């Protein structure tokens, strides 16, 4: 044999290295973020937080808010029906008692490159759509390409680091990555729903309508009353019903959702037995509105379930696309005028804690001054991020709860003067001499009473706050077109923040209708911090990068932080059962069941009719 020239030897060595890397990649039943061992072994029988022998049957009745006009949740058009995701299966499914571990669903086995440059999914041969057609690799490729091309903008952000998707065999699909730094990407791809190519290829995917789509999941759509109600039926011959990841799940024969336009009416409908379950989000209602015979007789159960998730950030969000809010001094000044202590005492019965961090209730929340590891991340950005990041620990203003906030108003007025604002004829005018009027856009009535004290505090400084409530459809359309001054916005966080942060904070998402960059952030420094967070190579590194990002967001005053609790408040009728062990990171409503030996609540006359249709 002739000796191989040296350049060819180098290429041959690289080939051997690649082959060695592929040989080291063994198919596995689960994926974890940092390759730690999953909680459940390959032969596990069911998750710990289910009743594996839960009875099947009955109808589970829920209430929705507003209405719906679409059965396509994947596009940025219309309002999709609640729970429509139950008709679809995903490649993998996330356990609800681990921070971020996924187990095979449509994909029975998963293979990941040791250097994180690709991931391969092996589809189960028994996986079927509801029409009996097998789920194949070409369906996965079709789904991915369709979501990238025609889906909501968030998918392009989620999958931005995917270079190529290949159907290698009818049941084997490979995703190649642009780089190997995004450790979350294999798990993000595991969340990919599998849409039927043969059903969608002759339909217009971007057309949001009420045609019942073909799915593969544990439920199918049985009946639609546009804007008013939707009914799902459990698929009796569901292909995945005996999988370990599904045992103890999907116990209701039917699930129905009736839509209401008013939260107060919805609560009265629950107490009248019109539906079975409610997640209560209003502290005052939880404290005072359930003093009824059904609760005292323990037929209507009130329960607080532990919530182990980061609570994230809910707040009054500024749209900094508006010139009014582009000066950070203005944003800080207005934040001084929310009297949380009075609001919590008078309106919330003291139920809440003030939110400070964008990663609240987690080890990713910034605390005190940045440590050495955080400074290593932040120092290269000095001069491009607020100076306070390096020298001060962020804190919300604190009042005495009396409702008198003269000191905060004086500080706010001083900041507004520095920004060029001034009082003219008892009205605040901005630096251009225009009277300041702020529209606060709402879709739900319960926040109006919360905003009224804030409105009064602004009025004391000559600022007019207009509270504008619109229906859900109009609200969503205005959010998508960024036609608002301020809103109540939420930035939920998981225990493993990653690709979704691009949708929240990055410049590329600011002009994408449908992204969650409600603020309109276009800051290269924040873009950099987000990418570094996504590419963190260990849990400790993720914590450090999350804290660094948190500090920059806090000192930008992009929202006026609201409040949080660390439990889920649920009310449900006593014919509903749930497992003794609750999952740490979810309510786990799909593990609940109907008790066959307890009669459901007999509905009384409804307080009002449900919504008549989405507008």
Model-derived regions: residue spans:
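N-terminal lobe/hinge region of extracytoplasmic solute-binding protein
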Residues: 26-115, 122, 145, 214
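Detector for C-terminal structural segments
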Residues: 28-31, 64-66, 79-82, 86, ...
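Aromatic- and charge-enriched surface segment that lines or borders ligand/interaction sites
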Residues: 50, 54-55, 77-83, 109-153, ...
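Gly/Pro-rich hinge or "lid" segments in bacterial periplasmic/extracellular proteins
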Residues: 87-98, 145, 189-254, 261-265, ...
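Aromatic-rich, solvent-exposed beta-strand/loop patch
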Residues: 106-111, 130, 135, 176-195, ...
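Ligand-site clamp/hinge motif
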Residues: 124, 207-210, 240-290, 336, ...
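Surface-exposed binding/hinge segments that line
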Residues: 156-201, 218-225, 369-382
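Extracellular/periplasmic solute-recognition and catalytic clefts
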Residues: 164-166, 222-233, 258-322, 329-333, ...
């Amino acid at each position: 044999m002739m000796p191989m020239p040296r350049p060819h030897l180098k290429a041959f060595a690289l080939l051997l290295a690649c082959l060695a890397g592929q040989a080291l990649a063994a198919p596995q039943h689960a994926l974890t973020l940092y390759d730690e061992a999953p909680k459940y072994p390959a032969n596990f029988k069911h998750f710990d937080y289910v009743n594996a022998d839960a009875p099947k049957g009955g109808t589970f009745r829920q209430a929705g808010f507003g209405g719906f006009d679409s059965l396509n949740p994947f596009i940025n058009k219309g309002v999709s029906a609640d729970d429509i995701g139950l008709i679809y299966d995903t490649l993998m499914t996330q356990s609800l008692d681990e921070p971020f571990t996924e187990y095979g669903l449509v994909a029975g086995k998963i293979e990941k490159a040791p250097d994180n440059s690709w991931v391969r999914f092996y589809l189960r041969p028994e996986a079927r759509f509801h029409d009996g057609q097998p789920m194949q690799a070409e369906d996965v490729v079709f789904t991915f390409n369709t979501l990238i091309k025609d889906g909501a903008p968030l998918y392009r952000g989620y999958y931005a680091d995917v270079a190529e998707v290949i159907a290698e065999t009818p049941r084997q699909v490979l995703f190649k990555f642009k780089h190997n730094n995004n450790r979350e990407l294999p798990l993000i791809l595991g969340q990919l729903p599998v849409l039927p190519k043969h059903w969608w290829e002759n339909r217009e995917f971007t057309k949001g309508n009420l045609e019942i789509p073909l799915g593969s999941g544990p439920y199918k759509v049985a009946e639609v009353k546009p804007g008013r109600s939707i009914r799902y039926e459990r698929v009796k011959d569901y292909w995945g019903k005996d999988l370990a990841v599904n045992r103890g799940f999907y116990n209701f024969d039917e699930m129905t959702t009736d839509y209401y336009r008013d939260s107060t009416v919805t609560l009265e409908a629950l107490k009248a037995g019109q539906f079975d379950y409610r997640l209560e989000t209003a502290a005052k209602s939880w404290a005072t509105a359930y003093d009824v015979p059904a609760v005292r007789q323990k037929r209507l159960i009130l329960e607080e379930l532990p919530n182990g998730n980061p609570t994230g950030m809910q707040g009054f969000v500024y749209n900094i696309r508006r010139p009014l809010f582009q000066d950070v001094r203005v944003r800080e000044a207005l934040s001084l005028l929310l009297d949380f202590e009075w609001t919590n005492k008078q309106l919330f019965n003291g139920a809440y804690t003030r939110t400070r961090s964008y990663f609240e209730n987690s080890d990713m929340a910034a605390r005190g001054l940045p440590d050495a590891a955080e400074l290593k991340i932040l120092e290269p950005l000095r001069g491009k991020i607020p100076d306070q990041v390096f020298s001060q620990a962020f804190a919300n203003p604190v009042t005495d709860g009396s409702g008198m906030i003269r000191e905060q108003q004086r500080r706010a007025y001083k900041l507004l003067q520095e920004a060029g604002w001034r009082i003219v004829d008892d009205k605040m005018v901005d630096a251009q001499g225009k009277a300041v009027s702020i529209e606060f856009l709402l879709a739900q009535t319960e926040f109006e009473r919360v905003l009224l004290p804030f409105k009064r505090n602004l009025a004391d400084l000559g600022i007019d706050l207009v509270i504008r409530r619109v229906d859900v459809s109009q609200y969503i359309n205005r959010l998508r077109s960024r036609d608002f001054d301020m809103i109540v916005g939420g930035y939920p966080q998981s225990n493993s923040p990653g690709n979704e942060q691009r949708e929240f904070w990055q410049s590329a998402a600011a002009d994408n209708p449908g992204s969650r960059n409600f603020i309109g952030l276009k800051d290269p420094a924040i873009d950099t911090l987000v990418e570094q967070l996504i590419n963190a190579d260990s849990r400790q590194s993720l914590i450090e990068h999350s804290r660094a990002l948190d500090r920059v967001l806090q000192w930008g005053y992009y929202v006026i932080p609201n409040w949080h609790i660390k439990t889920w408040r649920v009310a449900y009728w006593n014919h509903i059962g749930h497992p003794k062990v609750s999952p740490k990171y979810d309510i786990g409503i799909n593990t609940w069941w109907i008790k066959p030996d307890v009669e459901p609540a007999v509905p009384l006359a409804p307080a009002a009719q449900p919504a008549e249709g989405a507008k």
